[in-house]
């Protein structure tokens, strides 16, 4: 079990994704300063975790937060006018929120967490599923005019779905919390197909052909 400073947000950070933040609230300004202080040898990593629907940003406690979040490596920080900062971070590994560390003594929330591994699931299926998801995303982008800069690594592909398809927090959280790569790819395919059907029903897209395929 490790400890990690948390930045609760109304969004979900995916591994490999960039997250720009404008920081002005005093407790998170302090978090940023602590990360930049460099008094220990650890990388400047904090945890981004989504707030559950019905709770506010200021609500404390595990109940207000989703159980799975993503580490965020601070890659850039710049001071703005006043006590404001612009920071850019990049998603690293997923973690499970075990408990709030009440003894941390920090103005921001510090948590006890467990870093999560990335199991593959059914390895033979992954290549097929990744090819299908890549085709679905490419067709969706072509039909809607969205950008689709897709990672080449199969394991990372499902994490990139929100970059092309607009998903709400609940769906993003389901992708992040999927137990393995296989199940995440399957979920990604279902989500892209659903959004394409929504867009078709609204008359917003044409029909870029996709070869027949079964998830079974």
Q: Across the structure, where does each feature detected by a protein language model lie?
A:
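N-terminal low-complexity, acidic/polar interaction/targeting segments
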Residues: 1-216
């Amino acid at each position: 079990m490790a400890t990690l400073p948390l930045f609760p947000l109304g969004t979900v950070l995916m591994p490999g994704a960039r997250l720009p933040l404008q920081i002005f609230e005093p407790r998170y300004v302090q978090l940023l300063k602590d990360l930049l202080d460099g008094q220990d040898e650890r990388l400047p990593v904090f945890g981004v975790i989504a707030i559950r629907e019905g709770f506010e940003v200021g609500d404390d406690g595990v109940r207000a937060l989703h159980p799975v979040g993503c580490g965020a490596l601070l890659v850039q920080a710049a001071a703005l006018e006043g006590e404001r900062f612009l920071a850019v971070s990049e998603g690293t590994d997923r973690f499970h929120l075990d408990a709030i560390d009440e003894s941390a003594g920090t103005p921001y929330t510090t948590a006890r967490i467990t870093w999560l591994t990335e199991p593959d699931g059914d390895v033979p299926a992954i290549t097929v599923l990744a090819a299908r998801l890549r085709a679905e995303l490419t067709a969706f982008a072509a039909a809607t005019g969205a950008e689709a800069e897709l990672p080449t690594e199969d394991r990372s592909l499902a994490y990139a779905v929100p970059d092309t398809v607009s998903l709400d927090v609940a769906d993003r959280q389901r992708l992040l919390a999927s137990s393995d790569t296989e199940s995440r790819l399957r979920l990604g395919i279902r989500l892209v197909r659903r959004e394409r059907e929504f867009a078709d029903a609204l008359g917003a897209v044409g029909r870029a052909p996709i070869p027949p395929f079964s998830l079974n």
